[in-house]
């Protein structure tokens, strides 16, 4: 069995480290949900953990009927997996969200989601300062991307947030 036949993901290594586009080599599963066949674009910023988290999110979405796209202009859902390790990374993440939110004025883009460290750390201020955001997903809950995207389409139109707190040392 090759990695590709098992649906394993691979990265485009010729892109800059801090911005990688991810590809999945598997066929999507059809679903009757209102979200099936939506096109998804994901931009990853930051560390290797974010790359892995992005791969897991994309695999989950694709396995539930979402179509992945290489360009944001053809996506109905745009996801930005952010970084907040340094001030420069936070600024880059915010600028990327703002740049990609411009696609909401196009005919295709319906939803913008921010995930990762920036949303985990600055969830309240992000929700207030970037009203274009439809969803927030913290760095501790990336496996909930499918539930978040579905809730954005089935919800009230308000910002959807799925943010888990890190466990406190005393709770472990």
Q: Where on the chain are the PLM-derived regions?
A:
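Proteins enriched for Cys/Gly/acidic motifs involved in redox and nucleic-acid/cofactor modification
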Residues: 22-172
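Short, Lys/Arg-enriched N-terminal segments with co-localized hydrophobic residues
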Residues: 5-24
């Amino acid at each position: 069995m090759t990695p590709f036949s098992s649906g394993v993901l691979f990265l485009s290594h010729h892109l800059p480290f801090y911005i990688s586009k991810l590809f999945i080599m598997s066929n999507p599963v059809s679903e009757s949900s209102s979200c099936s066949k939506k096109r998804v674009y994901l931009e990853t910023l930051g560390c290797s953990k974010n790359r892995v988290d992005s791969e897991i999110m994309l695999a989950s979405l694709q396995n539930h009927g979402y179509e992945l796209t290489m360009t944001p202009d053809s996506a109905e859902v745009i996801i930005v997996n952010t970084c907040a390790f340094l001030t420069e990374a936070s600024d880059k993440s915010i600028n990327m969200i703002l740049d990609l939110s411009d696609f909401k004025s196009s005919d295709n883009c319906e939803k913008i989601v921010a995930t990762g460290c920036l949303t985990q750390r600055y969830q309240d201020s992000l929700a207030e300062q970037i009203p274009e955001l439809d969803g927030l997903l913290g760095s501790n809950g990336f496996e909930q991307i499918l539930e978040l995207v579905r809730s954005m389409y089935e919800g009230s139109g308000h910002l959807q947030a799925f943010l888990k707190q890190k466990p406190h040392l005393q709770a472990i």
